[in-house]
């Protein structure tokens, strides 16, 4: 499995210069592809584009391709090739299913002139030595916590440098051996329901845990307030595009969400390992943000939480721990009565009902947290009602006394 060790660095003139060359190469190669397609009706392959760019000069008379290391230039062209192939597949799908799309797909766009684009270094074009990434004789990047990660990253596959509002994100891609899912052990299952006030509701026969999402919601509310203020200032000054302060605001939010999601996913997987859970079921509907309709305010709260990223963090951490993870759609799981084993699906009348916000009244006469009810139904969707884990979860009564975690930073 491939993993990424990430860290950020500040502004660097040498890296900035290389990123601008990368941006110029991207735009130049894309222009040649589009012109060839328009005039000759020919799709240039990666190899054809690579051959052309090796001899194509820029406006200053230099060859962008040769201003970077060969492997870096090749990786930029591969990104273009990947984007073009993705466009082609999307167009073919659009012709068959036009209703899936809001508008007709377009060719990849040019990057902003004078801006910066990613750099990609393979193990052939750079090395890690003495706690530093050596990009050239005059350019190296210190690696934080090198002693902790040195054994993992010494045989890296690729290093990516991504421009940010306040510097650069460095990503070291390395490989680890996959941990096999243990077989022969007694199956123990946990399930997760994702939401807003309760970001994660985790249910198993050993624990019922609610990870509060209110601090994420509060952060997003403050983010929206500041962004609205910056937008009004920008409009008054008649500034086009996004300002530096807005870029910094987006950057800070990105860092905050990434940190929170890593901490939550780590705590979840640690709980699963301690309880010897063998399978985790996660309720997640792909594309649910596009069609969500839970009111204007709730829509904004919901769509500003990148649940797909949290799910991806859980996937790779469970895989490393040898825990099987199943991603399943969660339709009607919040409406059906889990304690009464109501069949999960659409009904004219449901056995249970919402007593008040966050509380579900079961037809068995018991009250249960609404998100806990949803999490248990997500598990039922995958393993069925005859599964011993379902019976044990209900019998042990931990469903009715969930533990709430409001601070993931300690």
Predicted regions located by residue number:
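Substrate-contacting helices/loops that form the catalytic groove of nucleic-acid
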Residues: 38-55, 59-60, 165-311, 389-410
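Positively charged, low-complexity nucleic-acid-binding target-recognition regions
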Residues: 299-410
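Short polybasic amphipathic segments
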Residues: 124-136, 199-203, 357-363
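Stable alpha-helical structural segments in soluble proteins, enriched in small hydrophobic residues
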Residues: 25, 29, 72-87, 370-382
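Secondary-structure transition/turn motif
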Residues: 132-142, 172-178, 204-206, 339, ...
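Gly/serine-rich nucleotide phosphate-binding loop at the start of the catalytic core
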Residues: 1-75
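Acidic carboxylate diad motif detector
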Residues: 48-164, 300, 304
